[in-house]
Amino acid sequence: MFDPLHSGSVSVNAGSDNRTFSSVVLDRIEDSAADSLVFGNLGIRYYKHFYFAAAVKRELLNGLELSVGTKYHRRSIVGHRTEEAVDARLKDVYRQLAPHVSIVWQPRMYYYVKEGRKVNIGSRMPRLSLDVEQGVGRLFASDGIYTRAEADVQYSLQMGGDARLYLRAGGGGFFHTDDVYFADYAFLRENNLPVERSDELGGVFQLLDSEWYNAAKKYFRLHATYESPFFVVQRLFPKARLVENERLYANVLIMSHLTPYSELGYGIGTPYVDAGFFVSAKNLKFHSVGYKITVSLFGD
């Protein structure tokens, strides 16, 4: 860490990510009829993803944070090539060098200073995040040129008493694409939990098939979670003290062939377990039902 009064830091990380597929598959998706689209029939070849990232982060103003760095992606095809399954344009290995800029702004941030270090507490204002990555082609054997731009807004609104409404909205896409690229988003991810949350079930999709996270050139998403300690259970069973909160969930995703994908859910929260039941619809038609449970070993 440097310049602790402005939360300065340098980060370096590397690792492997989920398997993904190339933009060639996105073209096949757009050419397919929405009602008959089956990922297993698209001849998808997946790529293993290794990445290296380095960034410098600093708070420019109170609540305004800037991160600048670069990312290196190496994607190698899984298994052996078969001409029936793989488009002739595809290579076995793709390398992509991409400068990266991220901005996070949350106005009226409350903070305190301890031992010369600024510690942010929180804000009652919305949190806005912007994330841009620029693929640089033909530099250090890098493949393809693209611009990925995304925005994410989160807001926690006190509704009176102990009730609270959590909102999240965002969107993004790939622009100025040249040749093959990989639609790997920063915010549209299975594990991208919101900062403004009270549990790990709201603000993300619970029943969405994993292939869809990389299946869009552009997307828009909207999430809402309403939380209250006095909703159904406490009214019907006043002595059910273990249930601290009840939650209603609504999630919407709009992208190619999903117009829209939606989820509705109901959940309960206890000191040790959060559980939710969800129903999903694809293009206004019933799709699936399911449930999710998260466990906290030590409670709050």
PLM-predicted stretches and their roles:
Residues 1, 14, 54-58, 70, ...:
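Residues on the lipid-exposed face of transmembrane beta-strands in outer-membrane beta-barrel proteins
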Residues 3-8, 62-66, 76, 106-113, ...:
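Repeated loop/turn-to-beta-strand initiation elements of outer-membrane beta-barrel proteins
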Residues 9-27, 35-44, 116-120, 127-232:
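C-terminal outer-membrane beta-barrel translocator/porin domains of Gram-negative envelope proteins
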Residues 15-21, 61-63, 73-77, 106-110, ...:
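Structural signature of outer-membrane beta-barrel domains
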Residues 17, 22-161, 247-249:
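Transmembrane beta-strand segments of outer-membrane beta-barrel domains in Gram-negative
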Residues 29-33, 97, 164, 225, ...:
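Outer-membrane beta-barrel transmembrane domain signature
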Residues 46-52, 93-99, 143-149, 216-224, ...:
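Residues that define the transmembrane beta-barrel architecture of outer-membrane proteins
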